[in-house]
A protein has these predicted regions:
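C-terminal motif of bacterial Sec signal peptides marking the signal peptidase cleavage site
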Residues: 24-26
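N-terminal pre-catalytic segment of deacetylase/amide-hydrolase enzymes
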Residues: 32-34, 81, 87-160, 316-318, ...
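N-terminal secretory signal peptides that target proteins for export/translocation
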Residues: 1-11
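Extracellular LysM carbohydrate-binding repeats and other cell-envelope/extracellular binding modules
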Residues: 30-35, 53, 60-98, 307
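Solvent-exposed, polar/charged alpha-helical surfaces in well-ordered, non-transmembrane soluble domains
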Residues: 52-57, 66, 70, 124-135, ...
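Sec-dependent signal peptide recognition
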Residues: 11-18
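Metal-dependent polysaccharide deacetylase catalytic core of the NodB/CE4 family, i.e.
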Residues: 101-116, 157-161, 169-275, 301-307
């Protein structure tokens, strides 16, 4: 009964605000007008107003424009629009009466100016995919935001997506990074430490890795040698296998020697493969999350050490690309 009464009070409050918005509507074309109610502000934006501007004014955080947009079902505001600004943040987890929110994590590997292959995405295709995200109203969020969502600490925009790149190919620096910067998208690069400065392959060097980090790219790890952590090799004893796991993961955490002054928090499994022993090692070593290449989006209740990622192959057109962007599930939680 208490919950029903609370919903009724909230409903009455919103109806009062909507009526207020109708009365304020005549103020369009002049500076923003607003009226404050418990938990909400009724706003009719003036000339030049934006969602981020409203968020800065009423929520004290311009990055929370998405909260206003999600609440009102809009991507932008125009003078004369009738907008409700919720003063309380949405609950974490994205659970509604219709289902629950999911966050897709995209996985790229290598890029090329003119050619594509299974693991190589052509520059024009990558740029078209980033433009598609913008045009369709997706919000590209950081890995830290994703983990806060998974840990039920903070909400994320309703159409959130994460971008990751594996290995450490030079094309990340030459091709992907400029495009990501142009769109203002955060992204994470999972590097194999032994792959950097490799004279036999076209890979990044440590100066370029540092420059990527300085430019805003999150640098995380993909082990030292890209070996399969979940399988022992032929003739390998249990003791040797344990030592190899420890060496692969400890080497990956030796950030200081590369001039990258912070500890890593996340691992991308080579080949997406993991198991209980590998996860136990990660937990004991303080990793906060780890990523597979199992295709699918992630609800807040996903195992943080088995986070799904969808590999974007070089032959994907925009229809195939879009199939990897599910941001809501109507399945019942049981």
């Amino acid at each position: 009964m208490r919950n029903d009464n609370g919903r009724k009070r909230r409903s009455r409050c919103i109806w009062i605000i909507l009526l207020s918005l109708l009365l304020l509507g005549g103020c369009a074309g002049v500076p923003t007008k607003a009226r404050t109610y418990p938990g909400f502000v009724a706003v009719v934006p003036g000339d030049g107003e934006t969602l981020s501007g409203l968020a800065k004014k009423y929520l004290n955080d311009p990055s929370k424009g998405w909260v206003i947009g999600d609440f009102n079902g809009i991507d932008t505001v125009k003078p004369g629009d009738r907008v409700i600004v919720p003063l309380q943040p949405p609950p974490p987890g994205g659970v509604t009466t219709r289902g629950y929110q999911t966050v897709p994590v995209l996985c790229y590997h290598n890029f090329s100016l003119t050619e594509s292959g299974k693991m190589i995405v052509k520059r024009s295709d990558f740029e078209a995919q980033m433009k598609f995200l913008k045009d369709k109203g997706y919000h590209v969020i950081s890995l830290n935001q994703l983990i806060d969502f998974i840990q039920y600490k903070a909400p994320v925009p309703s159409k959130s997506v994460v971008i990751t790149i594996d290995d450490g190919w030079r094309s990340t620096y030459d091709i992907a990074f400029p495009i990501l910067k142009a769109y203002g998208y955060p992204a994470t690069l999972f590097i194999c430490t032994d792959m950097i400065n490799n004279p036999k392959k076209i890979t990044l060097n440590w100066d370029e890795v540092r420059e990527l980090k300085k430019g805003g790219m999150d640098i995380q790890f993909h082990t030292a040698t890209h070996c399969n952590l979940a399988k022992s090799v032929d003739g390998e004893t249990a003791s040797a296998y344990f030592n190899r796991l420890r060496q692969e993961l400890t080497c990956s955490r030796s950030y200081e020697q590369f001039g990258l002054k912070k500890e890593i928090r996340y691992l991308a499994y080579p080949y997406g493969d993991t198991g209980p022993l590998v996860i136990a090692f990660l937990e004991k070593m303080g990793f906060d999350g780890a990523f597979t290449v199992k295709r699918g989006s992630n609800p807040f209740f996903v195992d943080p050490y088995r986070i799904n990622r969808s590999t974007i192959y070089g032959d994907y057109d925009l229809k195939k690309f879009e199939k990897n962007l599910a941001t809501f599930s109507s399945k019942a939680m049981r």
